[in-house]
Amino acid sequence: MKHNNQLPVAQLRKHQQFRIKTFFNQAAQKKARLHARRAQAAAVFPRPTEKLQPVVRKQTQRYNKSTKLGRGFTLQELKAAGISAAFAQSIGIKVDHRRKNRCQESLELNKKRLLAYVSKLVLFPRHQGKAKKGLVNDTADTSSAAQNALQTSVPLPSVSKREKAVSNIAELRKKKVYRIIRQEKTNQKWDGKRKAKAQAAAEPKA
């Protein structure tokens, strides 16, 4: 309810109760989800229950200072870490062929994330006694002795840092930072058309 309006009087009929969605099974559904999570953890044991995801920036200028887990690693990040896309998907790494790396920082961050995951990885041979060599060497041990209680192998890093106090507050307040950023974006947007217009004006008219 908003504003100073009169309260609505719902003149309901008995047959209208079937058009209302109820959730009397909320506690039972909560229990079912718990059993499903346990069944999934038992099925993928000794692997983590979640696959490895990249660290990405949130969208829009308002939220892009914080990070979150993305959909999957780019092909450039996998190539930098020396992992093929097919092999990555087989060892619990999510791959997103649509995402692109816009800066070197994100590429290096996720490359380190991949290498940290691979350094912790323990692979067991598909066929007993036939271990393979590669980026991650197979072990001769059986998987029965392995233990893994982690939900995810490489958690999301905490990037929040406490800012140091500065003394030149008065000078900083005089600068209209948002206006400067918007002006630079506008200049970048119209740079091509302005150059074309200047070039057309500089050419001699026939």
Swiss-Prot record:
Keywords, ordered alphabetically: Ribonucleoprotein, Ribosomal protein
Protein family membership: Belongs to the eukaryotic ribosomal protein eL13 family.
Entry's Gene Ontology molecular function annotations: RNA binding; structural constituent of ribosome
Basic and acidic residues bias: start-end ranges: 184-193
GO CC annotations on file: cytosolic large ribosomal subunit
Native source species: Tetrahymena thermophila (strain SB210)
Region (Disordered): 184-206
PROSITE patterns cross-referenced by the UniProt entry: RIBOSOMAL_L13E
Protein name: Large ribosomal subunit protein eL13
Database matches in InterPro entries: Ribosomal_eL13 (IPR001380), Ribosomal_eL13_CS (IPR018256)
A biological process from GO: translation
UniProt xrefs under Pfam families: Ribosomal_L13e (PF01294)
